[in-house]
Amino acid sequence: MGSNLPAQPNLRVTIIAADGLYKRDVFRFPDPFAVATVGGEQTHTTSVIKKTLNPYWNEMFDLRVNEDSILAIQIFDQKKFKKKDQGFLGVINVRIGDVIDLQMGGDEMLTRDLKKSNDNLVVHGKLIINLSTNLSTPNTNQANGLHRSNLQSSTSSGLVPQVTAPHASPGPSQLDPTASNPSLNPQRVPSTTRPSSTVAPVNGAAAPGASRTNLSSFEDSQGRLPAGWERREDNLGRTYYVDHNTRTTTWTRPSSNYNEATQRTQREANMQLERRAHQSRMLPEDRTGASSPNLQENQQAQTPPAGGSANAVSMMATGATTAGTGELPPGWEQRTTPEGRPYFVDHNTRTTTWVDPRRQQYIRMYGQNANGNNTTIQQQPVSQLGPLPSGWEMRLTNTARVYFVDHNTKTTTWDDPRLPSSLDQGVPQYKRDFRRKLIYFRSQPALRIMSGQCHVKVRRNNIFEDSYAEIMRQSASDLKKRLMIKFDGEDGLDYGGLSREFFFLLSHEMFNPFYCLFEYSAHDNYTLQINPHSGVNPEHLNYFKFIGRVVGLAIFHRRFLDSFFIGAFYKMMLRKKVSLQDMEGVDEDLHRNLTWTLDNDIEGIIELTFAVDDEKFGERRTIDLKPGGRDIPVTNENKHEYVELVTEWKIVKRVEEQFNAFMSGFNELIPADLVNVFDERELELLIGGIADIDVDDWKKHTDYRGYQEQDEVIQNFWKIVRTWDAEQKSRLLQFTTGTSRIPVNGFKDLQGSDGPRRFTIEKSGDPAALPKSHTCFNRLDLPPYKTHETLEHKLSIAVEETLGFGQE
């Protein structure tokens, strides 16, 4: 055939990219390269693209061909090229005369499915090439080779290669919302986990891109995005959009008839929905917390304290007390400090307090009242909920459960002697535990508000920067004084409402992935985890300390943040060891692969060592999980150790610096030994509160597998959920979805690990077993229980006793 070929090259072949290659290794992505061959005589090889299923080469080769020439392009994995199968990933064969007329000339773009070889190995994906008879332009492979180092990417890190966009980078007005505060620049350098198609990569990082074709990040298959908008992909390959005009991100593509005024109106409407949802959150049975929905519904039937029930609910929401009048209780005395400040001495217990024991505080009482309701509001003197009675002591079990010791009778009890016995009647055990933990937690000296005021003045449109400056300049002891928030240009005194608004707005801003400090989890698009690449901002550790202070400040002053983290984050805050189960919210694919490794014989199937590859700002490193790990093979005998080490590295070690900075700020206000009284689910509720869950909306957006909505089991399930209070519903939501967070637009926007995922109840399991949950898929496996009572009993046990965020 060679004798029939022209003396000079007459066809230029450009191997552009492959898409969706087959992943043969459980844990590693291939290092693909392509080999182009004509008649076995002319062979050209592309460069190797590291760790990706979607390599982009864009390399040109000039060949001598005729119409009968067969162009064969094979894809191999460079890691396995010396193995028996050479890491074969697919091949295409093209007869030149079938696609292009060499005499007439032309230019053809081809997309072909990859085919199997004679070994019949499974292959997958497509190959994109270009054939052209125009050889007048110089072959730019050398230039491409120089540029290609900035285009190599890793699917595992969320980077997808792309031709550099011809569009200019967004201007300073779009990328610098912190011009008023030069120290706060978390977004000045593009994040490698949130790639954008700006032209100049920073620090040699991989040139960002969010498409596998020649589209820039300012356009997609539907056309160009509105001005100021950018398309990006997260570390899981999910497309999202950045609005540089407002410094916000969204999963929804802006419409072609995008109107800024309309969008602003929609944002404000969504913000109002979120604000109302946030301000209605509360803690279970927290006597100084916000009122519960059930309490408000039964408000007319409750026994109103002086001043009316509406006033009582309002005072409960702010933790307010009525003025102290009349004589002091027996055994009490009022004294004055040298500075003239009054304090009170309780000679009964030989203790002192700043709180006037005559002041009345509103608490919730449980048990049947005269109207048959389970909840009443009563006034309770603070002195009765002050120190424990003489001879009593509060202790913790080794599982952090609060109990009380009566040294007078040498007995112990779970019941708080300061609370009426009716408080615990008919209340579930886990709920009494949480309430007691709250009482214990907030009764500690370290959690008492100090005298004086802590003034924080911020601008609404600059709340992140102003809050950073205000909170970081004050000492921890100053932050423990009564918090007084002032919004610039607005009149108003802070009796609780302003501080709630402050934490609501600030949590929306500082946890915004736009700043690269946090990113969305693998579980959904509203729970957060620390961004391991936050170091793109050189001041990131200072911001994590600031965020830790804010979280501690909210807990200290009994306010809630409108943010929710992955379950592993709460475990880390409690210094608990993370497990493979926690990996599900961080990297679902890795979780599945590690689980497969534990459940199967891996000898001769997968080749692993005690090392992992990590890419940071374009630099790829091999990290030993243990000394000399890259030389230690993983076997059936040591695979459990390997899984533990990979889990710890992926969840903890990668963000250790950031997390330690966060905890240093947090522990300045909340001592570590006190917060450890809670478990990880309770800590989520302590930080974010409990939402009022709309059961009708939940039911409306639920799918069934194996069941019909009319089935008795399903009818009983929803009856049970309706009878549960807000905390039980939130715990059920935690159990089935991994978080108590509800999307702002309700259950119709519930997300799973792979995008929108409705809540699902599946008929699965033995009626003698407990229900199971799959949090990444928002699914509840519900056995076909015969009776209403059995279903409620089994479901309650599963929800209340399960450790962590779901069982599977």
Swiss-Prot record:
Q: Where is the active site?
A: C776 (glycyl thioester intermediate)
EC number(s) on file: 2.3.2.26
> Where's it found, cell-wise?
Cytoplasm
Q: Which SMART domains match?
A: C2, HECTc, WW
Q: Which residues form the WW domain?
A: 223-256, 326-359, 386-419
Q: In which residue ranges is the amino acid composition biased (Basic and acidic residues)?
A: 275-288
Question: The C2 domain covers which part of the protein?
Answer: 1-112
The terms under GO molecular function for this entry are: phosphatidylinositol binding; ubiquitin binding; ubiquitin-protein transferase activity; ubiquitin-ubiquitin ligase activity
Listed GO CC annotations: cellular bud tip; cytosolic ribosome; endosome membrane; Golgi apparatus; nucleus; RSP5-BUL ubiquitin ligase complex; ubiquitin ligase complex
Q: List the disulfide bonds.
A: none
Associated pathway: Protein modification; protein ubiquitination
Q: Name one Pfam family in it.
A: C2
Region Disordered: list its residue ranges. Answer: 134-231, 275-346
Listed under GO biological process in this entry are: cellular response to heat; cellular response to L-arginine; chromatin organization; free ubiquitin chain polymerization; mitochondria-associated ubiquitin-dependent protein catabolic process; mitochondrion organization; nonfunctional rRNA decay; poly(A)+ mRNA export from nucleus
List compositional bias (Low complexity) regions by residue number: 199-210, 317-326
Biased composition (Polar residues) is annotated at: 142-159, 171-198, 211-220, 289-303
Q: Which reaction does it catalyse?
A: S-ubiquitinyl-[E2 ubiquitin-conjugating enzyme]-L-cysteine + [acceptor protein]-L-lysine = [E2 ubiquitin-conjugating enzyme]-L-cysteine + N(6)-ubiquitinyl-[acceptor protein]-L-lysine
State the oligomer form and interacting partners: Interacts with creD.
Query: What family is this?
Result: Belongs to the RSP5/NEDD4 family.
Question: What is the purpose of this protein?
Answer: E3 ubiquitin-protein ligase which accepts ubiquitin from an E2 ubiquitin-conjugating enzyme in the form of a thioester and then directly transfers the ubiquitin to targeted substrates. Probably involved in the regulatory network controlling carbon source utilization.
Protein name from the UniProt record: Probable E3 ubiquitin-protein ligase hulA
Lineage of this protein's species? Eukaryota, Fungi, Dikarya, Ascomycota, Pezizomycotina
